[in-house]
């Protein structure tokens, strides 16, 4: 006949010698104790830890001991669930033998796996952030590719804004007491207005948005130059060349 009490006392003595710094007796009847299990150090010396509480059943080891997660550090809920499932499996497989050392060893290995998973997850997150930063920098450097369509669209917008600036400038001059120009005078001074576009832009401050990236690549935009045409005649037919 099995002497369960003797087997339990012998195992308790062995456990106390194996885990001198992490073994704590909670009660003697029924025998109940805790063992703190810590993983190996991971990145930045980070560890995960759990304290297991065991209570011998009357017919242990022919019956599984009672067990629970007494406390834990740095473990997710799913990690705790996995550890409890592992303990149940190991207890079932080792019925009839003293098993606390086997259960604790299995949990120790599981904690080491969790630390490795944390390290892998953080490395993947770091790589993902670096990839996103690289793509953002590349997009910022290259900008929007220039096409004839978006250049002409920008040019139309630029010309419209420039015209508004000219009108505003003329209105301000009129309000300042200057004589309003006639149609002929406006025509004659149009050249001066064109050559003073830069001054208008400076006065406008940030009112005109210029996308510099549109000027980076203009290979696809062909501008006609009459002087490159071999049949080009600067003197139109029928004009008086003596003028």
Curated annotation (Swiss-Prot):
Residues 209-231 have a biased composition (Acidic residues). Keywords: Acetylation, Phosphoprotein. The keyword Cell inner membrane does not apply. Disulfide bonds: none annotated. InterPro entries: GIR2-like (IPR040213), RWD_dom (IPR006575), UBQ-conjugating_enzyme/RWD (IPR016135), ZC3H15/TMA46_C (IPR032378). Residues 10-114 form the RWD domain. Residues 142-197 are annotated as: Interaction with DRG2. GO terms for biological process: androgen receptor signaling pathway; cellular response to oxidative stress; cellular response to testosterone stimulus; cytoplasmic translation. Residues 208-243 are annotated as: Disordered. GO terms for cellular component: cytoplasm. The modification N-acetylthreonine is found at residue 2. The modification Phosphothreonine is found at residue 144. Interacts with DRG2. Interacts with androgen receptor. This is RWD domain-containing protein 1. It comes from Rattus norvegicus. The lineage of its organism: Eukaryota, Metazoa, Chordata, Craniata, Vertebrata. The gene is Rwdd1.
């Amino acid at each position: 006949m099995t002497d369960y009490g003797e087997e339990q006392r012998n195992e308790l003595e062995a456990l106390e010698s194996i885990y001198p710094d992490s073994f704590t007796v909670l009660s003697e009847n029924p025998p109940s104790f805790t063992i703190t299990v810590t993983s190996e150090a991971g990145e930045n010396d980070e560890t995960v830890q759990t304290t297991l509480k065991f209570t011998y059943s009357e017919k242990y080891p022919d019956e599984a001991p009672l067990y629970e997660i007494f406390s834990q550090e740095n473990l997710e809920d799913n990690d705790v669930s996995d550890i409890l499932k592992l303990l149940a499996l190991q207890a079932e497989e080792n019925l009839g033998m003293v098993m606390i050392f086997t259960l604790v060893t299995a949990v120790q290995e599981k904690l080491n796996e969790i630390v490795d998973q944390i390290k892998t997850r953080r490395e993947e997150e770091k790589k993902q952030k670096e990839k996103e930063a690289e793509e953002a920098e590349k997009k910022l450097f290259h900008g929007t590719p220039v096409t004839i369509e978006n250049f002409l669209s920008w040019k139309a917008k630029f010309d419209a804004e420039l015209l508004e600036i000219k009108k505003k400038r003329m209105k301000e001059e009129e309000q300042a007491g200057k004589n309003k120009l006639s149609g002929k005078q406006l025509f004659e001074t149009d050249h001066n207005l064109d050559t003073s576009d830069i001054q208008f832009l400076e006065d406008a401050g940030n009112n005109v948005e210029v996308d510099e990236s549109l000027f980076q690549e203009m290979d696809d935009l062909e501008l006609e130059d009459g002087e490159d045409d071999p049949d080009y005649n600067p003197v139109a037919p029928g004009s008086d060349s003596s003028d």
